[in-house]
A protein has these predicted regions:
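Conserved micro-motifs of the catalytic ATP-binding
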Residues: 41-45, 79-82
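Short beta-to-alpha transition helix within the HATPase_c
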Residues: 48-65
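Conserved catalytic submotifs in the C-terminal HATPase_c
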Residues: 69-82, 110-113
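A residue-level detector for a conserved hydrophobic packing site
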Residues: 87-88
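Short conserved segment of the HATPase_c
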Residues: 127-141
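Short alpha-helical Gxxx[C/S/T] motif in the catalytic ATP-binding
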Residues: 151, 156, 160
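Conserved glycine-rich
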Residues: 168-169
Length: 171
């Protein structure tokens, strides 16, 4: 149905109206993809051995080629057992948030006693201390002024947390 709606919008003559409706349709598509990703998280993909460093580097390269300001700080191979598509989704959500609120993302992997941490850093305003738990609740968005400027559904960080916890990690 979303593709049919997108095709029909091409016939709307009012350019401003068409562009606004296209943006709404884009948001609906992102919401749909995120809800489906969350539903798949309950089952679906089986864990397998991958190189976390290569996985994250590939994602950063793809985003960089699409014009996203992403800096990847190379890491030696980092073998882990995970559901790679979920990990890619979580890192992508973090990078997209960093770019939306901090205008760029610096991504790196660090070795820890338990394995590896993926760090996504930006120069944005940060999340206020008293909002740091609430931001992981479904459909929660902070500051309405930021909502209009950055778009989004309020599911990105919810998915990040669910994926991290599903892999024995944390955000």
């Amino acid at each position: 149905p979303l593709t049919a709606m997108r095709i029909n919008l091409e016939f709307v003559n009012d350019e401003e109206l068409r562009d606004g409706l296209m943006r709404n349709l884009d948001e609906l598509q992102v919401l749909t993809e995120q809800v489906l990703a969350a539903a798949k998280g309950a089952g679906g993909e089986k864990p397998r051995q991958v190189d976390l460093s290569a996985l994250v580097e590939s994602l950063c390269t793809d985003l960089d080629e699409m014009g996203e300001p992403v800096n990847w700080n190379n890491h030696s191979p980092a073998p882990i057992s995970c559901r790679p598509n979920e990990i890619k989704r979580a890192v992508r959500n973090l990078v997209e948030n960093a770019v939306a609120y901090g205008h760029k993302a610096d991504v790196r992997i660090i070795d820890t006693a338990d394995g590896y941490d993926v760090l996504v850093e930006d120069e944005g305003p940060g999340i206020p201390e008293d909002e740091r738990q609430r931001v992981f609740e479904p459909f929660v968005r902070l500051e309405s002024s930021r909502n209009e400027a950055t778009g989004g559904t309020g599911l990105g960080l919810t998915l990040v947390k669910a994926i991290a916890e599903g892999h024995g990690g944390a955000v």
